[in-house]
Amino acid sequence: MSRKKPRPIPVPARTIPGLIDAHTHLASCKDDAAVLVERAGAAGVDKLCTVGDGLAEAEAALAAAHAFPQVYAACAIHPTRVGELDQAAQARLVEMIADPRCVAVGETGLDTYWIGKSETCAPLDMQEEALRWHIDRAVEADKALMIHNRKADADLLRVLADAPAPRATILHCFSSPLDVAREALDRGYVLSFAGNVTFKRNEELREAARLAPTGQVLIETDAPYMTPEPFRGSRNEPSLIGHTALCVAEARGLSPEELAEEVSATFDRVYGQA
């Protein structure tokens, strides 16, 4: 009887000084935040944004941002969970978003993939109402808007087009077709590329990374998800961002160090740290 080949243990790429991780979930990773931040630093990661996609997760993100100077927070209710966005949750989110260590409202957005597949997934009309609420909070607080989009390109572009514009709109874990990338870039949105840009079949994502003007590209792990090649399927963490950086740098015709400098400047600008 044949046995499945064990997955290799993920290890960081070569150390690339000045890296960033624009979107990660420290509270969902296996190890303690302090350990994750230390390993990320050893891999060259100078700063990262940890994301809360529910109220408890947002509290944890903000706590991590206060505990570590290189960590910032994003706070929101995930589109599939907007049934949790009651008045009490709204009031607490407004407080968290106002905190200087919170640099973005997110992740918010639209997700049609889970509608009908998950009993707890909110319907699209509720998701849209919650997205508009989050956009208003981002505008009021002058914070970036961090967007989750799964199988909702047309509806998302429609909502973003007729809503007030925040200081920056980041399409996290960008995974949409090239025509959506072009439309988003024309509007000035920032495309944040995760580990799936390294997947062999995703040449169109690499083309989107190539097309994006300077200042409209970020890189992220979305850890513990979206582990890049050659460790796809294993558990992700911020220290593995170098694999995505190498891929995006090659797509953009840059050295890894040049890409690190570019995305670090974009991180500072969109998250209000410049």
What are the language-model segments listed below?
Residues 1-274:
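Mid-domain alpha/beta scaffold segments of enzyme catalytic cores
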